[in-house]
Regions:
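Catalytic nucleophile serine of serine hydrolases
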Residues: 107
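Extended, subdomain-level signal for the structured scaffold at the beginning of enzyme domains
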Residues: 1-99, 103, 112-123, 131-175
Length: 175
């Protein structure tokens, strides 16, 4: 049996997402048996990654509910800087964190949990470019390929994706 069989994960997408940070976790979760829903500002819309790779959203963020999913994965790129201004994105992220569901962010994806106010006192990593933002939000910064603190999983950059995905699967299967 696959470790994530019949579990559902939410991922966010918008223009200028980091291509590998969306596609690698999405495919790894699917390989592990999960159903992944990629939600953007509009359902069925094509969004372009930083390197031009397209992603068509499965659903609109406005239609998503944290109760319908087992975890969330937030890719980086410049997309999180746009989506962190969306109250629905922040509410969803807060709910995943408050429900104790796997809440994973890589690179600049940490901007969304920062704006959602869920990183205070949490050990995390992220892109060195947002280190000060993480610390100022009350997070405990660690420079490591992956940091796991309870149900929170974070990584720094695309090179960390193998460790990031292993940690997401591990945290999910321990629940």
């Amino acid at each position: 049996m696959l470790p994530l069989a019949d579990l559902r994960f939410l991922m966010f997408v918008d223009d200028v997402y980091e291509d590998l940070e969306l596609w690698y976790p999405k495919l790894r979760l699917i390989e592990a048996g999960a159903h992944v829903v990629v939600a953007g500002p509009k359902a069925g819309e094509k969004y372009a990654g930083k390197h031009g790779y397209p992603c068509v959203s499965d659903a609109a963020i406005a239609d998503m509910e944290a109760a319908d999913f087992h975890g969330i994965v937030i890719p980086g790129g410049f997309m999180p800087d746009k989506l962190r201004r969306d109250p629905k994105v922040l509410r969803l992220t807060r709910e995943f964190a408050e429900f104790g569901k796997p809440t994973a962010a890589i690179c600049h994806g940490g901007w969304i949990p920062i704006s959602a106010g869920v990183y205070r006192g949490v050990r995390v990593t992220g892109s060195p470019g947002i280190k000060d933002d993480l610390i100022n939000a009350g997070a405990i910064w660690e420079d490591a390929p992956v940091v796991v603190d309870r149900h929170f999983v974070s990584s720094r950059k695309p090179d960390d994706l193998p460790a990031f995905c292993r940690a997401i699967i591990d945290v999910t299967t321990r629940r």
